[in-house]
Structure formats: C-alpha cells, structure tokens
C-alpha cells in the first residue's frame, strides 16, 4: 500500500503555521510582561489548587450528610415495620371479634395486647423523631458548602476576568472587527505539570520559545 506523501507546499504551509504560532506566543508573552498581566494570571492560577481543595471539601461534606441521613433511615425502618405489623394484626383481631364475638377470656387477651401496643407506640415514635432530627441536622452542611461554592465562584470569575483582559489587550487591529465568537475556544486545556514534556513555569516557556527560534 502506498504511503501518503507530504507535498512541498504542505511542508511550507505547516512551517508557516508553526512560525506564526511561535511568533504570536512570543508576542503574547512580551505583552503580558509589559502590561503586568503575567503576575495577575500567575496569582489566578495559584487559586486553582485552592478551588480544587474547596471542591473536595464540598464533596466530603455532602457525602457525610448523605451517610448520616441513610443511617437514620435504616435505624428507623425496623421500628416503623414493627408498629405497622402489630397494628395490622390487632386490627384484624378486632374485626374478627366484631364479626364473631369471642369468649371473655379471649377478649381480655385482645384488650391486653392492644394496651401493650399503645404503650409501645411512644417509644417507637420517639426513636423515629430522634432519627428525623438527625436527618435534619445533617443538612447543615448546605450552609458551609454554600459559602465554599460562593468563594469558588469568585475565584472562577477572577480567572475569567484576567483571561479576558489578556485577550482584549492582545487582539491584532486587523482582526478586531466584529465576528461570530467561538465559545469553545474559551475552554483551555488541563495541564498536568508532572507529565513529561509539559512546561511548568514562565522561564520554561521562554526557554522553549528561544529553542524554537522565536
């Protein structure tokens, strides 16, 4: 099978694209320094780990609240099942008694069982109320996480503001005419500085551009 070959024109076009990207990157770096925005962006970037920690805190608090609520439901369920079962059994016995009155001894036993059921109900309901209160108290995480989320929104807005400043200050004059915005371009890549080949500082960016001849 014949391998596709790259025409000289294609090689020339690719070289032009790389050269333009390098030149634009260098221009952007120099403009950032002149405008003092490089430090502002660095400060915004430092806020990202803080936002990540806050997100983790929100996840933890939400998980803890969910676990507390589920534990309370599981603890209350047997008490509710027992009351339901006893109430249905007593109702059936009383219906049978009204349909066919039983002996006095059996009637006394039915009355005794009914009184015992009524005596047990407050204990079951008190336990259930305590679990319901626990479920309600578990929702207090919303106040804390609400503050955290608000702080995170402030961080995101600051990063957005800094990035928009960079874009507005570095748009070439010939390209400043109104045009349809491509919102997808606002989504920047995620950078993992622990990976090989990923630059992690401004000096490394400058060295990379110098090595490429820009």
Swiss-Prot record:
Membrane-spanning intervals of the chain: none
GO cellular component, one term: cytoplasm
GO biological process: archaeal or bacterial-type flagellum-dependent cell motility; chemotaxis; regulation of chemotaxis
GO molecular function, one term: phosphoprotein phosphatase activity
E.C. number: 3.1.3.-
Record's subcellular location: Cytoplasm
First-listed, main subcellular location of the protein, grouped into a coarse class: cytoplasm
NCBIfam families (UniProt xref): PRK11166.1 (NF008368)
Subunit details: Homodimer.
Function: Plays an important role in bacterial chemotaxis signal transduction pathway by accelerating the dephosphorylation of phosphorylated CheY (CheY-P).
Annotated protein name in UniProt: Protein phosphatase CheZ
């Amino acid at each position: 099978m014949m391998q596709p070959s790259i025409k000289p024109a294609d090689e020339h076009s690719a070289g032009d694209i790389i050269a333009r990207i390098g030149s634009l990157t260098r221009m952007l770096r120099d403009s950032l320094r002149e405008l003092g925005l490089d430090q502002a962006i660095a400060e915004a970037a430092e806020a990202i780990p803080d936002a990540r920690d806050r997100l983790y805190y929100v996840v933890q608090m939400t998980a803890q609240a969910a676990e507390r609520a589920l534990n309370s439901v599981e603890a209350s369920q047997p008490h509710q099942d027992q009351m339901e079962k006893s109430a249905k059994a007593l109702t059936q016995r009383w219906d049978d008694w009204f349909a066919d009155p039983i002996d006095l001894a059996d009637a006394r036993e039915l009355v005794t069982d009914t009184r015992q059921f009524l005596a047990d109900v407050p204990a079951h309901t008190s336990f259930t109320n305590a679990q319901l209160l626990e479920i309600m108290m578990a929702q207090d995480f919303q106040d804390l996480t609400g503050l955290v989320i608000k702080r995170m929104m402030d961080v995101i807005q600051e990063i957005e503001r800094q990035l928009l400043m960079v874009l507005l200050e570095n748009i070439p004059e010939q390209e400043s005419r109104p045009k349809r915005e491509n919102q997808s371009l606002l989504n920047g890549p995620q950078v993992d500085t622990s990976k090989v080949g990923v630059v992690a500082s401004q000096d490394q960016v400058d060295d990379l551009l110098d090595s490429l001849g820009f």
